[in-house]
Design a protein with these regions (language model features):
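Long, charged, low-complexity intrinsically disordered regions
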Residues: 1-6, 166-179
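Nucleotide-state-sensitive switch-loop elements of NTP-binding domains
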Residues: 2-10, 15-123
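Conserved GTPase G-domain signal focused on the G5
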Residues: 16-17, 153, 177-179
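Short, surface-exposed amphipathic charged segments that create phosphate/polyanion-binding patches used
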Residues: 75, 128-130, 178-179
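Phosphate/Mg2+-binding loops and adjacent switch elements
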Residues: 85-165, 169-172
């Protein structure tokens, strides 16, 4: 059909994926009138309101089951909606291989992989689900730790990511909005 730029926003439940997508869509540099399809693989804490979607020429397609995400599904979305780009809000509990199999079989062209991490739970995830966490970091172009505070061990987190992906950019955002 046609090459379809895709931005993968990946992380565990309530790690800030929807918030990042909403903030990105509302930025002038990104909101240039292109039609954006948001594929969501979970229902999180933050919802996409109708006004924001209209303002940013965006729409949401919810995928209830991973089995529903197929090359036929993607091609059907292209035929029915004619999006200019796709933002994929992907749950960190799902296998990335399943997603990449479909990406490789379709016109989706992965432009950027962003991983969001709730810094207040990152230590727990690193201890209990290290392999899943590291899998996300391996593919990431950008890792954003949000909800940071004075006790966030930024150096340790940065080293963990750089050990598996030296090219990844790592950013930290404080919960209180301070620099």
């Amino acid at each position: 059909m046609y090459e379809l730029p895709a931005y993968l926003v990946w992380g565990f439940l309530e790690s800030g994926k929807s918030t990042l997508i909403k903030e990105t869509l509302n930025q002038d540099y990104f909101n240039d009138g292109e039609k954006t399809m948001i594929l969501t693989f979970e229902e999180g804490e933050v919802e996409y309101d109708k006004e924001m979607l209209e303002k940013t020429n965006s729409f949401v397609v919810n995928i209830e089951n991973m089995e529903d995400f197929t090359k036929e599904f993607v091609r059907g979305c292209q035929r029915n909606y004619y999006p200019d780009r796709v933002m994929i809000e992907y749950n960190g509990m799902y296998s990335i291989d399943d997603l990449m199999d479909v990406v490789d079989e379709t016109d989706l062209e992965l432009y950027q992989v962003i991983v969001t991490v709730d810094a207040s739970t990152a230590d727990l995830y690193l201890k209990n689900m290290k392999s899943m966490f590291m899998e996300m970091f391996k593919m990431a172009d950008l890792v954003i730790f949000n909800r940071c505070d004075d006790n966030t061990n930024m150096g340790s987190f940065r080293r963990s990511i750089k050990a598996v992906n030296p090219r990844a950019q790592v950013g930290f955002e404080r919960a209180d909005g301070k620099e």
